[in-house]
Amino acid sequence: MRHGKKINHLGRQTAHRKAMLANMACSLIEHKRINTTVAKAKALKVFVEPLVTKCKNDTTHNRRLVFSKLRSKEAVSELFREVAPKVGDRPGGYTRVIKLGSRLGDAAEMALVELVDFNETYNVGEKPKKKKSTRRAGKKKTEDTASTAEPKEASAKETKKEEPKAKEPKAEEKKDDKKEE
């Protein structure tokens, strides 16, 4: 029976599993997103969320607790320096797991793990404003060019009408020349 066994051991012994999760967490903090299997992604989410919660309160004690899990000075400093200000008002749910499908070699279910506040695709609050301003500017330019293009077209039509009239007298002159001869 499986009573009281809440942790996914991921087919590894304790030291190997802890080292793997620490390395994956350091990579996630450094790159803000990583690709891995779904099982590892779920285990990583459980591993990283409490660390990010601890980094919101920058004390020596919290830094030492996070360092004991991550074992990387660079990751700890980046977590407290860059990640903490962005997630300061978020009450949890700092990571997102997106399923990607099966891996080609062994058909393992793959997932993308990312820090929520560092993704530009889903953070649409800033981008649409930029797009709208560029679109509006683009439309005004096209309207200006369209309004300037219409008089050109009208003047082009007038010149076309004038040209056939100019050609017709030449034709008549030729006919008159032939009659006179």
Swiss-Prot record:
Q: Where is this region: Disordered?
A: 125-181
Q: Does the keyword Cytoplasm apply?
A: no
Q: Which Pfam families match?
A: Ribosomal_L17
Which residue windows does the record flag with biased composition (Basic and acidic residues)? 140-181
Compositional bias segments (type: Basic residues): 128-139
Any GO CC annotation of this UniProt entry: cytosolic large ribosomal subunit
Any one Gene Ontology molecular-function term assigned to this protein's record? structural constituent of ribosome
Reply yes or no: does the keyword Nucleotide-binding apply: no
Family annotation (SUPFAM superfamilies) = Prokaryotic ribosomal protein L17 (SSF64263)
Subunit comment = Part of the 50S ribosomal subunit. Contacts protein L32.
Family listed: Belongs to the bacterial ribosomal protein bL17 family.
The record's section on PANTHER family has: LARGE RIBOSOMAL SUBUNIT PROTEIN BL17M, RIBOSOMAL PROTEIN L17
In its UniProt entry, what is this protein called? Large ribosomal subunit protein bL17
Organism listed in the record: Christiangramia forsetii (strain DSM 17595 / CGMCC 1.15422 / KT0803) (Gramella forsetii)
